Amino acid sequence: MNIDLNADLGEGCASDSELLTLVSSANIASGFHAGDAQTMLTCVREALKNGVAIGAHPSFPDRDNFGRTAMVLPPETVYAQTLYQIGALGAIVQAQGGVMRHVKPHGMLYNQAAKDPRLAQAIAKAVHDYDPSLILVGLAGSELIRAGERCRLVTRQEVFADRGYQADGSLVPRMQPGALIHDEEQALAQTLDMVQAGRVKSVTGVWTTVTAQTVCIHGDGEYALAFARRLRAAFNARNIHVIA
């Protein structure tokens, strides 16, 4: 059994270089919520050195609140902003002799696109128009995945090791109780349930089905590095291969 393990990087965390030895895919902040030209270049070089698949991590323009502010923008604006960020990282990747492999929206852009078909379509179209061979990463079972499929993109359905789920398969909003899982044992058990059994237990106790093609470890999490090591060990013990 194979699984992709991804992390959001280039967001100012000291553990980036170590995480790049443990994950198979890196979502690199592309300037709108965190990161700049230099951090993108540094992350790209480190990812290439470790053989890690590189992806753009576009966001709403919200550096003050780390891309976590809800915004209502015209789809054409979201299309342009997404295309701009993909292109910025893509230029750096190309200049370093690499190939960009995927795009995963960040924060509130990701969450809103999971439920808003018009927003999801704008993102998927930007990805397709930049490079139709790119993989679009989105919340499992979400509108973003459906938009990617409509645009004939390869999609990858994502699950989260350290986030609480609602009964409909969506993430618990960050400001609500149960949004974040701080207990490593709970996060590990949830991840293995999603990967091996295709199910997740919601904060209300209801089990729901989920398709896990890639698992996210938040690079800005306090225990991200230690948890990544534990998760890799758990995968190895169960003959689950981490591969992009």
From Swiss-Prot:
This is 5-oxoprolinase subunit A. Pfam families: LamB_YcsF (PF03746). Keywords: ATP-binding, Hydrolase, Nucleotide-binding. InterPro entries: Glyco_hydro/deAcase_b/a-brl, LamB/YcsF/PxpA-like. It catalyses: 5-oxo-L-proline + ATP + 2 H2O = L-glutamate + ADP + phosphate + H(+). GO terms for biological process: carbohydrate metabolic process. It is an enzyme of class 3 (hydrolase). Catalyzes the cleavage of 5-oxoproline to form L-glutamate coupled to the hydrolysis of ATP to ADP and inorganic phosphate. Belongs to the LamB/PxpA family. Coiled coil: none annotated. It comes from the Bacteria. Forms a complex composed of PxpA, PxpB and PxpC. Its EC number is 3.5.2.9. GO terms for molecular function: 5-oxoprolinase (ATP-hydrolyzing) activity; ATP binding. The lineage of its organism: Bacteria, Pseudomonadati, Pseudomonadota, Gammaproteobacteria, Enterobacterales. The gene is pxpA. PANTHER family: 5-OXOPROLINASE SUBUNIT A, UNCHARACTERIZED PROTEIN YBGL-RELATED.
